[in-house]
């Protein structure tokens, strides 16, 4: 399980260094093999272990290519999916097209989200957090049953 937000830097080749606390888990679970793709709703990237990505690919394979909405999701997620291997120094090379999509240049936030990481431009991340907090404080929408049952 991945959690927490960590500021990291991309090097001049577009590599990020995975924080030490995640490396053993990633090597154990997937031998450092990862898959990165775009997020369909936010200006960030999604980074999965290969084993977790294979579960998603299986779900995507059950969608119909004849249904326009399902085909779009397949095209966007699979079309942007890029395998990346963590090297011995704990670095992952992100494809240039993915970095451009999310506006990743230098300062990046690696955000744990249970079974995956999100990769954000640092400024975009802080703006998203600010926007999310404002939305929560001003919402008039009733809470879903699941949120009502969540006790913190």
Swiss-Prot record:
Pfam families: MraZ
Main location per the UniProt record: cytoplasm
Localization: Cytoplasm, Nucleoid
GO cellular component: cytoplasm; nucleoid
Domain of life: Bacteria
Quaternary assembly: Forms oligomers.
PANTHER family, sorted: TRANSCRIPTIONAL REGULATOR MRAZ (PTHR34701:SF1)
NCBIfam families referenced in this protein's UniProt entry, alphabetically: division/cell wall cluster transcriptional repressor MraZ
Family note: Belongs to the MraZ family.
Protein name: Transcriptional regulator MraZ
Gene: mraZ
């Amino acid at each position: 399980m991945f959690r927490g937000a960590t500021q990291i830097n991309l090097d001049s080749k577009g590599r990020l260094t995975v924080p030490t606390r995640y490396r053993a888990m990633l090597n154990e679970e997937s031998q450092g093999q990862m898959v990165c793709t775009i997020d369909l709703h936010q200006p960030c990237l999604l980074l999965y272990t290969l084993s977790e990505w294979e579960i998603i690919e299986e779900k995507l394979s059950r969608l119909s290519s004849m249904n326009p909405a399902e085909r779009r999701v397949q095209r966007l997620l699979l079309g942007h999916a890029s395998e990346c291997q963590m090297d011995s120094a704990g670095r992952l090379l992100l494809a240039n097209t993915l970095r451009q999509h999310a506006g990743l240049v230098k300062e990046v936030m690696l955000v744990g989200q249970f079974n995956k990481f999100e990769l954000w431009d640092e400024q975009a991340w802080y703006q998203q957090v600010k926007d999310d907090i404002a939305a929560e404080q001003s919402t008039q929408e009733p809470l879903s049953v699941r949120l009502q049952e969540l006790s913190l």
